[in-house]
Amino acid sequence: MATAKKSTAKKASAKKTAAKKPAASARAAKTDATVLLQRDHADVKKLFRQYEKLADNEADGQERQALAMQICQMLTVHATIEEEIFYPAAREAEVEEDLLDEAEVEHASAKDLIAQIQAMSPDEELYDAKVTVLGEYVDHHVQEEENEMFPKCRRAEMDLAGLAERLAERKSELMAEEAA
């Protein structure tokens, strides 16, 4: 009985502290966090398609490497803003824990592959294969986020417009750090 009360109190407390949705008209005027993240997904998918064309045409190693590094940077920044801002907000709003746990494990796998790619020369064996597999990891991750996690986040009491602002600000900071 005491644990049931604690559990109920914990859920009530989490719901009180979770950022609330603004009015529908205010939401429409601003970008939603899931839309911002989906734009990142579309941008990186486009880069992977460009990389595939370069690899298929046996393009110069430097050109492939430059594009691979751009992909790695974009994914690193994207994963960071999700892990620092979006996932904690989703956890606070009590979005399905298993989805969030799996997303973080997928990020860890992608980061490992990113580190391998960044440490390689484009002329090394398996370079193109590693970039391709990274793209496959990302496709899987994106499908789960966009088809499962994001709809649940939209139904949860999350301030997606406020999160979008925080995500965009942090993304700008990280991109500036990378450029420096």
Task: Please describe what each predicted stretch is.
Residues 2-180:
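Small-residue-biased structural context
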